[in-house]
Amino acid sequence: SGGFTLAQRAELSAEAFSHTATYDIAVATWMAAEVVGEDPDFPRWRGASWTRRDVLRYGENPHQGAAVYETNPPQAGVATAIQVHGKQMSYNNYVDADAALRAAFDFSEPAVAIIKHTNPCGIAVAESEEQAYRKAFATDPVSAFGGVVAVNRTVSRALAEAMAEVFIEVIIAPDFERPALDVLQQKKNLRILRMPGPGSGEGTEGRIVTGGMLVQSIDEVSAEGDDPSSWSLVAGNAVDADTGRDLHFAWRACRSVKSNAILLAHDGAAVGIGMGQVNRVDSARLAVERAAGRAKGAVAASDAFFPFADGLGVLIDAGVRAVVQPGGSVRDDEAFAAAQEAGITMYTTGTRH
């Protein structure tokens, strides 16, 4: 007679408890930081709640179920980006879009990152977003096919027309000009995401492991050693301004590459990327192979030190003229001596990514 059914009352009760639980978590978190004085990033007790945003077709593989959740309260990020066109996002689309967004927003100038399986297969900066895209695509055109593209500027019609020339899974950017959407929306399956900025800016990130969770501060290119003015010249002569800009670009771009990572760059663009190898020699070889003739005269960044001089030797033999790396190996002197003997410049940052 106009009342609620038992099932409806149960559903409303569950919803009410989810709201009160979220509120209790917020209160407990605030009290730990503000009243008890615990470190807000790594408190003794940690709680959070999420609301399901969508059920996905499947997870990383077709036999895995999956869903995407947003934080309570919602925060800026890939999970809350506005999809303005295209097929439903997949689990892998979300993972790659997150990596692409972080890579593109590592730069203040117009930048484009093209991601496949969480690794950049193209990344570049330029005076315009269209130029940055064309340079990023030229890094590895074969691998860029079917990639996820992030732009840290509004997408113009010119950029949209360039991207429409090839198959792309996802494009994520702060905004899109109306004429750009008119071009891109002709591709009915292309997923277009509007994401106003680089993300929520939270200081930590977590990773679920069996029996618990690891939490760490987010790896951003903002440490003292990320400033080129703090780098130490350990071999060769100081570089000119153009080479210095390329070294700085290579160092920032290398952060988004899975270790062991070697990135070769020229004119504000990656020309060869070696990623995810279990030793630095193979990463150097892969970067040189991908760069082909473009390795000669390029600069290189390594995400960690050279444990031996052999990986550096691969770069020297390919014609790389300057290298930036963290340093810190017990055999640093061997790498420094090899660079000096080859007549190339080497800087150390004292920071690892």
Could you tell me what each predicted segment is?
Residues 1-29:
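Beta-strand/loop-alpha-helix module characteristic of Rossmann-like adenine-cofactor folds
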Residues 19, 23-353:
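ATP-dependent carboxylate/acyl-activation modules
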